């Protein structure tokens, strides 16, 4: 091999490495709202999904029951007749079906509602959404993301019934800005990407999450 050809190959390799680095840097700088997760046909989106199930319980610390037909979400209160509804920042809880499937793959016998989520979602990457993000569900309901995960001070019935509780790590909470009906099959759309803050979330809740392993 001549010296000239060897230098040419080195230049080509260097150019390829530089191009790869530039492309990687550009990818890192893309906003997650625009990029989503588009690695394949089954990849989760950060902008759109669907309601897989709506679940309700009369008591806290228990599994929720999947409800057939539409369920009412009341503005600034939460899911009608659900134990977690009220005047606080965790009015409506969401958990991705993809998270439940991961638990099932580990051998847990779990389904929609078993981790006490109000709405089981499908197709949307909930964990990529920052605080303050607003979701429109169906025609009327508007929710704002107020908390990511939670702290379990003691293992509740859900942990013992399911063998683990993934909600503290992968569940998220919302306040209901507007009310309406929600049912399985409804669309979920990000209408506003949050800036990482939510006026409804008390500082002590954020401090507890930051200082407690889950």
What are these regions (language model features)?
Residues 114-124, 164-177:
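Short, structured beta-strand/loop micro-motifs enriched in basic residues and often containing a Trp
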Residues 174, 181-184:
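Conserved ATP-binding/catalytic segment of the ANL
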Residues 156-166:
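Short beta-strand-turn/beta-hairpin segments enriched in glycine/proline and small hydrophobics
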Residues 139, 186, 190-192:
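Conserved "cap/hinge" positions at secondary-structure junctions
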Residues 154-158, 200-201:
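A short, polar/proline- and glycine-enriched secondary-structure boundary/capping micro-motif
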Residues 2-149, 181, 195-214:
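Electropositive, beta-rich accessory/interaction domains or terminal extensions
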């Amino acid at each position: 091999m001549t010296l000239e050809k060897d230098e040419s190959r080195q230049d080509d390799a260097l150019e390829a490495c530089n191009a790869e680095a530039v492309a990687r840097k550009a990818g890192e700088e893309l906003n997650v709202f625009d990029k989503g997760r588009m690695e394949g046909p089954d990849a989760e989106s950060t902008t759109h999904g669907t309601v897989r199930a709506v679940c309700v319980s009369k008591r806290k610390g228990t599994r929720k029951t999947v409800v057939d037909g539409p369920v009412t979400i009341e503005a600034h209160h939460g899911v009608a007749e659900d134990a977690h509804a009220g005047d606080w920042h965790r009015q409506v809880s969401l958990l991705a079906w993809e998270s439940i499937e991961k638990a099932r793959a580990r051998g847990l016998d779990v389904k929609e509602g078993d981790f006490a989520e109000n709405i089981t979602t499908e197709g949307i990457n909930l964990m990529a959404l920052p605080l303050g993000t607003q979701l429109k569900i169906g025609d009327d309901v508007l929710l704002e993301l107020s908390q990511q995960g939670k702290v379990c001070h003691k293992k509740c019935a859900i942990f013992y019934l399911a063998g683990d509780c993934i909600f503290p790590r992968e569940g998220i909470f919302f306040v209901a800005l507007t009310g309406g009906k929600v049912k399985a099959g409804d669309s979920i759309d990000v209408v506003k990407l949050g800036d990482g803050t939510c006026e409804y979330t008390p500082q002590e809740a954020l401090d507890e999450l930051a200082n407690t392993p889950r």
